[in-house]
Amino acid sequence: MLQPIGDRVIVKVKEEEEKTVGGIVLASNAKQKPTEGEVVAVGEGAYTSNGDKLPMVVKKGDVVLYDKYSGTNVEYEGEKYLVLHEKDILAIEK
């Protein structure tokens, strides 16, 4: 598995539905970019300018929401992931 560095988080992207509620099949270019996923790996945290380490708020297994323009898409061993900075995570699902 990939191990993020610093304040980065690796999220397994939750794929969007192929059909609408009414049963209409969506073309691949009509689907919106996913904005939800499960955290699969967390970096050690960022450091302040004076060397103090900031703890990570998110943890492995959290389901998170993020902006559709955030992060870097990565494919690893056939799976789609997103590498985000923790600050790009908008919310944790409870």
Swiss-Prot record:
Its main location: cytoplasm. GO terms for molecular function: ATP binding; metal ion binding; protein folding chaperone; protein-folding chaperone binding; unfolded protein binding. It is found in: Cytoplasm. GO terms for cellular component: cytoplasm. It holds the Pfam family Cpn10. Keywords: Chaperone, Cytoplasm. It comes from the Bacteria. One of its GO terms (biological process) is chaperone cofactor-dependent protein refolding. InterPro entries: Chaperonin_GroES, Chaperonin_GroES_sf, Chaprnonin_Cpn10_CS, GroES-like_sf. PANTHER family: 10 KDA HEAT SHOCK PROTEIN, CO-CHAPERONIN GROES. Heptamer of 7 subunits arranged in a ring. Interacts with the chaperonin GroEL. Together with the chaperonin GroEL, plays an essential role in assisting protein folding. The GroEL-GroES system forms a nano-cage that allows encapsulation of the non-native substrate proteins and provides a physical environment optimized to promote and accelerate protein folding. GroES binds to the apical surface of the GroEL ring, thereby capping the opening of the GroEL channel. Belongs to the GroES chaperonin family. This is Co-chaperonin GroES. It comes from Lactobacillus acidophilus (strain ATCC 700396 / NCK56 / N2 / NCFM).
